């Protein structure tokens, strides 16, 4: 079990981005579609770093927007593997919003993304062959 825990820890992914005008909506907050795009990207990187296999998103589950993300702020996206199946895994992504010129930081969005590993024929393949 420790090997799995170590593999999960090594796969954690953290990315920072600035919220620029091209990603905001008419309320000058981060557009929901842009948020989902960033979250899926971080989840994909996390899944790939964990498995080192070809991974595809098969679902995004329960994405909760709990705090607005104003333009001119910073966001940190953190992806962690939370479940590993035979051919699929689940990644939880947390998005924190930070003020640029203060220490204020809030958890703004959370979501869960499921990925499946594919072989060269694009069929599901085991993520951890031989692992128990």
Give each language-model segment a name.
Residues 19-23, 60-67, 97-99:
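Short, well-ordered turn and helix-capping elements at secondary-structure junctions
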Residues 52-73:
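Small beta-barrel nucleic-acid-binding modules, principally OB-folds
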Residues 2-59, 116-132:
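Hot-dog-fold acyl-thioester-processing enzymes
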Residues 2-15, 69-71, 82-132:
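HotDog/MaoC-like acyl-thioester-processing domains
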């Amino acid at each position: 079990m420790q090997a799995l825990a170590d593999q999960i820890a090594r796969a954690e992914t953290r990315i920072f981005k600035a919220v620029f005008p091209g990603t905001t909506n008419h309320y000058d907050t981060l557009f929901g579609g842009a948020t989902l795009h960033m979250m899926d990207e971080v989840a994909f990187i996390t899944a790939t770093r964990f498995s080192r296999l070809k991974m595809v998103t098969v679902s995004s589950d329960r994405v909760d927007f709990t705090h607005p993300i104003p333009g001119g702020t910073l966001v940190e996206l953190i992806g962690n593997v939370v479940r590993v199946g035979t051919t699929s895994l689940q990644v939880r992504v947390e998005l924190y919003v930070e003020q640029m010129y203060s220490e204020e930081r809030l958890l703004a969005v959370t979501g869960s993304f499921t990925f499946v590993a594919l072989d060269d024929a694009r069929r599901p393949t085991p993520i951890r062959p031989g692992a128990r």
